[in-house]
């Protein structure tokens, strides 16, 4: 809780609107400055105003693909809204694996000159959590069907987002 730390985020007067599953979703940019470092957050209470982050004691949220797709694509939208061209985008685990997948393959992102010089670093903290969904997740995020192969995102009949985050940049798979 930022308030307990005495940090008051400022809401930047930018509302982001972009498509998930072919429907518009909205988010607000919140920014904090702490010891000279600015951190931007994406706010959407429908996706993240919940008691639990990933799941309840009964299991995963049914919309986790959309929630973390919103986070991944929203990070790119924040960069564009603030005209911040990142040199490096550091993604962590399956929850942000859609970001490198979408930069490489999503129709309106793959040719976007805004990110042409950006590079992605992908860190895996816990390989047990892989973000596996039905193959229709490709359509939800405007990704081509040809990605659903054993050399791509397919893993035992499901789309595996963690695998996709690794496979997009083959050099990651070669690291020791």
Residue ranges: model-predicted function:
Residues 1-176:
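Catalytic cores of nucleotide-sugar-dependent glycosyltransferases that transfer UDP/GDP/TDP-activated
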């Amino acid at each position: 809780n930022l308030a307990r730390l005495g940090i008051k985020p400022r809401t930047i007067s930018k509302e982001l609107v972009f498509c998930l599953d072919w429907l518009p979703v909205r988010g607000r940019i919140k920014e904090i400055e702490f010891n000279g470092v600015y951190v931007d957050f994406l706010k959407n209470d429908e996706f993240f105003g919940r008691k639990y982050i990933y799941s309840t004691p009964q299991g995963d949220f049914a919309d986790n693909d959309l929630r973390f797709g919103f986070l991944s694509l929203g990070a790119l939208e924040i960069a564009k809204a603030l005209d911040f061209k990142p040199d490096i985008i550091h993604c962590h685990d399956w929850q942000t694996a859609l970001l490198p997948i979408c930069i490489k393959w999503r129709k309106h992102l793959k040719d976007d000159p805004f990110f042409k010089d950006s590079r992605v670093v992908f860190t895996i903290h816990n390989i047990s959590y892989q973000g596996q969904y039905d193959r229709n997740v490709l359509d939800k995020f405007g990704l081509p069907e040809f990605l659903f192969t054993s050399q791509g995102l397919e893993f035992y009949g499901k789309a595996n987002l963690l695998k996709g985050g690794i496979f997009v940049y083959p050099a990651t798979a070669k690291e020791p």
